[in-house]
């Protein structure tokens, strides 16, 4: 997400004059590709060289912000980029925006990427549970030995899984940076990735479940923005509203971690000879 956010903002600032309103959308492609390249580091370390997944992930979490800020200072000679002038904008849904009450809340002056993300979760569910590729991908995370016996290339499928996660993480970071912070700095991506992990666990490793959990965490994050405008929360200090998403993350993990069953081979290196 960090590298995707940096790439998305950099692409936006570089090509906004030549690409116009398509700039933020095309920046998602660039951010996704950078996410894939960065995820390959993790894939090579854990799949090919069988490094510990936690150690490799920790190294990348330390490397990404440091590399991004180094590049920001090298390009802009300061600690953050300039603010972008072109974002995804707001969208009104025809017909739906005319519905009393609900139309004003959900379908008028809203973010289109949010609805695209919801639609994508259903597409991801279909691919994972209803297609041959998805079943193979799940099998190498559940029981790689059995998958190998059936002729499935475990290493290739695991590489595909990591690269897809890098693609989506890069796109997610670019959307976050261009929708909320409108620039990139060291504090642009602080915590959303870990909240995404919590959403995955809360959603029991299902795309639709993770989407619903993300909506829950997103609603808690929005309290920091609009909480003071709500009568029930107007007297609550802003700092408490800002930490609410992370407190809820800890509570959810403590309550549901034992109930959410992860794939049996999650985080376990596969050795073909065993």
Each model region followed by its residue ranges:
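Transmembrane helix-bundle core of multi-pass membrane transporters
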Residues: 64-129, 231-241, 267-274
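Cytosolic-side transmembrane-helix boundaries in multi-pass membrane proteins
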Residues: 142-149, 153-156, 227-274
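Short, non-helical or kinked segments that cap or interrupt transmembrane helices
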Residues: 1-7, 47-60, 136, 180-194, ...
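Hydrophobic core segments of alpha-helical transmembrane domains in multi-pass membrane transport
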Residues: 5-11, 65-69, 114-127, 162-172, ...
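Helix-loop-helix "hairpin" substructures at the membrane interface of multi-pass membrane proteins
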Residues: 106-184, 207-208, 212
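Transmembrane alpha-helical segments in multi-pass inner-membrane proteins
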Residues: 169, 179-246
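Alpha-helical transmembrane segments within multi-pass membrane transporters and channels
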Residues: 18-65, 221
């Amino acid at each position: 997400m960090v590298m995707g956010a940096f790439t998305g903002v950099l692409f936006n600032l570089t090509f906004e004059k030549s690409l116009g309103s398509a700039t933020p959308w095309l920046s998602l492609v660039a951010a996704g590709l950078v996410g894939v390249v960065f995820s390959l580091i993790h894939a090579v370390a854990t799949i090919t060289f069988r490094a510990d997944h936690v150690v490799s992930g920790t190294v990348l979490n330390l490397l990404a912000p440091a590399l991004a800020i180094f590049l920001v200072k090298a390009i802009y000679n300061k600690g953050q980029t300039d603010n972008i002038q072109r974002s995804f904008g707001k969208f009104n849904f025809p017909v739906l925006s005319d519905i009393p009450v609900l139309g004003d809340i959900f379908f008028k002056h809203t973010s289109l990427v949010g609805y695209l993300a919801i639609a994508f979760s259903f597409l991801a569910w279909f691919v994972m549970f209803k297609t041959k590729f998805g079943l193979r991908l799940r099998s190498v995370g559940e029981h790689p030995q059995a998958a190998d016996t059936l002729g499935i290339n475990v290493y290739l499928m695991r590489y595909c899984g990591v690269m897809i996660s890098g693609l989506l993480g890069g796109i997610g970071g670019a959307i976050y940076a261009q929708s909320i912070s409108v620039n990139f700095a060291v504090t642009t991506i602080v915590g959303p990735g870990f909240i995404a992990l919590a959403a995955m666990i809360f959603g029991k490793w299902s795309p639709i479940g993770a989407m619903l959990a993300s909506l829950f965490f997103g609603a808690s994050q929005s309290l920091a923005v609009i909480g003071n405008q709500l009568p029930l929360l107007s007297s609550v200090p802003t700092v408490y509203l800002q930490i609410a998403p992370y407190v809820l993350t800890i509570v959810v993990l403590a309550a549901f971690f034992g109930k959410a069953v992860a794939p049996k081979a999650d985080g376990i290196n596969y050795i073909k000879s065993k």
